[in-house]
Structure formats: C-alpha cells, structure tokens
C-alpha cells in the first residue's frame, strides 16, 4: 500500500530539518569506513594485548581475515531482565566460530533498575545513566579491533544508551540481542490494586511485598508494557533485532535459536562482503519514524519522547514532539497491553505481538516498508513471526485476524483511530501526555492546584488527607537540569486512589512518569523546566489549572497582568549523597524535547 500522506509529510519534515546534521554524520561514518579495518593497522604489541585474554580463538584472530565481533553487554543479576545474559558471551563465541568469525566481550555497561530505585535517591541518576552507557559503549568499541558488534541490553536507559554510543561507530554492522520477558506471574491489575490498598493503609507491608514478588518472580523483563518492553518494540521497527525476537521467553529453544541467528548474521553483513549493512545506514529518518509509529500504535512509554530524540541526534537526525503529535493523529491504537489494558506482554505476544503490529501498519501505509534492516532490504520480514520447524528457525505468516482482539487488533478495527500521545501547550509551557490508558472523560481536567517541589511531600499530603478533592498536583524542580528528571511513578497509587474516590485528578510536572504509569492524566516533561525559569515556577497553591488533551491546552487560569508580574519560586538546594554529586553534568543538559542529554549538548550534536 502507498505511504500515508501524513507519514510522508512528517518524514519529509524530519529529513529537511536534519540535512546539515545527517550530512555531517554520514561524512564522518564514511571517513571511518574508508580508513579501513582497524586490526591490520594496529601494532603487533597492540594486537597481542587484544588477543591475550582469548584461548581457542587466538589463532583465528591472529589470521586477521575473520570478522571479530565486539560484544557490549549490560549483564548484571540485580536486574532480572539482564540476568539471562550471564551465559550469552560463551555461547556467542561458539556460534561466531561456526560462522567463520570470532567474538570477544568488548566491554560492559551499567544497567540500573528503575524498579529498584523508584522513589529513592538513586532514581536521580537514572536518566543520566543513559549518557554513561553511551560513553561506556564508545569506550568498549574504541579499541578498534572489531568489525561488527552485538549489543546485549533491554531495559529503560540501556537500549537508548547502547544505541547512542553505537551510532557513533555507525560504519560497523551491529545487532541488538534481547533476552525476553519473564513468564506471567500475578496479573498486573492485581498488583496495582494491592499497591492502592497499601497507599490507603488497607494492606500490610508483608502483603505488598508478597504481591510484588509474585509479579516480579524470575529472570526476564518485567511483563508490563513499560519502557523496557517499548524499547524492544522500537528496535524491532528499526530493523535491528532478528525479526520477532522481542518477546520470546528466556530459556527456550526458540530464544536460543534467535540469538544464534543474530550472531551468525553479523559476518554476512560485514564490510568485506557484498551485503554490507552498517548501523548508521539502517538508522535513518525513515527508521526513526517507524520507531515512533509502533510506539504510538501500541501505547508505548512516554520516556521515548525523550529517548528517541536522543537516539536520533546521535545519528544526525532531529525529531521533535510536534512530529510525535502529528504521527499520533495518523497512527491508530492497535494494542492494549498493561497499563493500557489488562494483558501483559506474554499475552500480547500470544495474540500476535510486535510482528502482527508491524504487518498491520505496513498494510495501512503507516510505516516505511523500504528501510534497510539487518534482515533484508525491507521491513516485510518483521511482519512474520519466528517459530521452530524440525528444530530449525523459520519465519511464518500471521493469520489474518489477531489471536485475541481484546489485546491486539487490525487496522480495520482499531481500539482508537489515533495513537496514544498528545502535546499540550499554553502559558505554562509545553508538555506531553499519554492518553492511551486514560478514560476519555478525563482528557480534560480543570481544578485548583497544589504545588510541591518534592514527591515525598505529595505522599505526606495524601496521607494527611489534604488532597481529597478535585486537584491538579504540581511537582516542579524535577527536570533534567534540576535533579536528573527522576520518574515519579510512586505517585501513581495515591493519585489513583483519589481518582477512584471520584475526584478529578491530574499531575503536572517537569519530571517524568514511568512507562508503567497509566490511568491518571499526567502532563509531563514540561519545558522549560522550573530551574530554567519555566513558568511552572509561577504557580501558587489554589491557582486553577486547565489540562485538555482534546484541544492540546495547558493553561494557568490566572489574570494575565498578575501572571506576568509574578516572581518565580526559588529552587530548593540540591540533594547530595548516593553519588549524585558526581553527576553534576546534568545541570548542563538539554531540554526534554531535545533528549535531555548533557553529553549530546556538550558534543554539539
């Protein structure tokens, strides 16, 4: 089918805006490519150091004619999603040798779990761990002894950080290799209900802990459709996975065969062959639009309104929130996965999963089908699902209908004609809102505000019964330059309790919410942020705030003369400890719409 005119128009807008940056990026990648393979140009002592830690691969490496794959791993066993990676490098080295290549662990990158740090000091390091991961990826690949790379990462900041670093080595072919979601525990809705009961004082700490352990019970990605699983959806659409690899459970034969296929695909797309597919050419403007389209079609995480612009900038591409807003009005909502529905990602995969969504969007002309991928010269392969036949990996066509139309639908009968995001603007600045999980009658909230500068103060006010009314809860000084833009997901249960009581409730913040957040309308990522002089700093308790996702309005209903005359509230002193003082570079970060990166800002990218 021909490309939808709005998809084409947004893509053209991005291409035009990105011309200088993209041209400079491609020129740099061409320069690196034309410099030739690194190993033949290294000194013998340098090479000896590179090979010293190897055993059975040393002779093959010394030969110099095989691709040497650099494995960049985000393994740790504190993060359940990454725990399966423990044995991956050993297996990958064997599979590489079978394919006539070699492989080494080039380096490790940090991988923090937002689920562990949520609501605590460590969360203030979360967003800027992404820059650290990008820098660590660059260090790993800087040894110049690799002709390709395999990136092992899944979770919130890890995939964006890996991509940001990897794209500065855009002349190399690369694959991302996921680990898959843990199997389903208790229902996410049941978990959320216990959290609300605990917030109301109706469930004990032991009951809450038992519920959480029943939900997060094993190795693999958390099963809700938050940022980690949105990452996987995005990477599929960009053509950087083996098709359909995203949501196959760990420890299965199919998972193993997909990982093997990814490793053995790299030598086939290397720069010394006839099918050279460098990551810098795969990730172009069309791939970025495709990533945005699948996120919108599935109600993906709001964090990608920050991450995707940062990834794009690393490849010389500029995408802004207006692009997301325009795409959201063209792309229908095809999936309802918790927190946008009741099913988890395992149910989503059983109903058809990412490959069904991609097939449908291609069928409707809502994605670019002619993009370069690691698999082929079009995205069509990503509309087929992987399977095993006689123990061999194959890809099969989907049935015409979804396996469960309460979870996943075709473009002919979507859950909504539009996607899940909206941009809001007015005298408070510019913010975004995820509406895919918000009931339509709550798309507009107009109520007095209560202003906080700390999320813990919100909890205290809730416990004291001070928020039991129609209210817009304002939490400011939470932006990237203030304190690292922590997620405020811990506010979801108390705000949900207020909403359940019948009050009309909304959140307004220059910070972030988790990709797991849902039913309470939240205007987030507000720019400019309070510490940068943003007008959110003018709000006072009792001001009427109007948030309207229907009309794209975010307005303080204050007399204009009074509003202009108001002074900004002073910023609270920065919190120290837990290593936060080492991340002072956050104070030089770009605004959220540009990706909220201090690293990219300093690099002039």
Residue ranges and their predicted role:
Residues 106-144:
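N-terminal small/polar loop signature for handling phosphorylated ligands or for N-terminal nucleophile
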Residues 130-137, 144-149, 459-467:
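Contiguous domain-boundary segments centered on the initiation and propagation of an alpha-helix
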Residues 137, 141-162, 175-178:
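A short, small-residue-rich loop immediately preceding and capping a beta-strand
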Residues 84:
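Glycine-/small-residue-enriched capping loops at alpha/beta junctions
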Residues 87:
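Acidic/charged coordination and interface sites in well-structured regions
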Residues 1-77, 81, 90-107, 120-122, ...:
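Catalytic or ion-coupling anion/metal-binding cores of large enzyme and transporter domains
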